Amino acid sequence: VTFGVAKPCHLLPASEAAVGRLTIIDIGLDSADRTAVVERLTADDVAAAWPVPTAASDKYSRGVLGVVAGSAAYPGAGILCVLGALGTGPGMVRYLGPAAVAALVHVHAPEAVTATGRVQAWVLGSGVDPEDTDDEDQVRWIRQALDSDLPCVVDAGGLAFLAPRTAPTLITPHAGELARLLTRLAGPGESEVTREDVLDRPGEHAQAAADALGAVVLLKGATTLVVSPTAHGRPVRSQADAPPWLATAGAGDVLAGILGTLVAAGVDLVDAASVGAFVHGLAADRANPGGPVRALAVARRIPWIVSGVLAGLYTG
């Protein structure tokens, strides 16, 4: 139980596990003129931020997402990323990847387009091995997207190609990936950042990456953090909407697709990361409440979660 408003210790990874069920008692404090340090979105916030089409919308105005994901070693990543994107409600998804993976994508998602063309945002790197040079086209597509002025959601193997860019950039590492990224950005001769370092001080390391790259960082974990560059002056976002069962292979690929659709629709990166994490977590919870959940089941549940959020079925 706390009074007035939630405190940072109630919402941040280092201490949230000890909080249990949080009850906030209103004691009449006026916090309207105070700037939050940490924010957490509710279902009502998510509904307000969600991009809803109108009668005047077409597939291009709703957002066309390009996806460079999946590989011979990890074909499922391409499929799951595309399904996550499609379930979130894009105008179109263009998939670029190995021909064998593209064929599998078409089996699971015949509406996906496997040809180049205009896009409004990219998802890059899910299931891509940066050390595998067999598919030169895929590496070229990732580099070209990062060199463009289009918004990019960069996940997994795509992080190995990332340098500071001026275009909108959202990265989605887990602790190990963030450690490797920070070590690379620091350069030779600097101390290695380890996964344990990130887990001990997640907010600090996410902030370091955000400042170094000029990017929004979604650091995945039991409590997901969304951190923007210090110069932007925005509070940290903290979402803890997913069950522990979501710690499973492919879940991050689905999340990357969700985020890509939101970014292609023009949603602000911090909002896209936060509402995407909320819907991803709730989809996992509702796919099989209280039990194991597959990433594919999460992807298939997304449209129902979105409609439920917009209908006000999940209060708060």
Task: List PLM regions with ranges.
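Small-residue (G/A/S/T)-rich helix-start motifs and N-terminal tracts that mark the onset
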Residues: 5-170, 175, 180-316
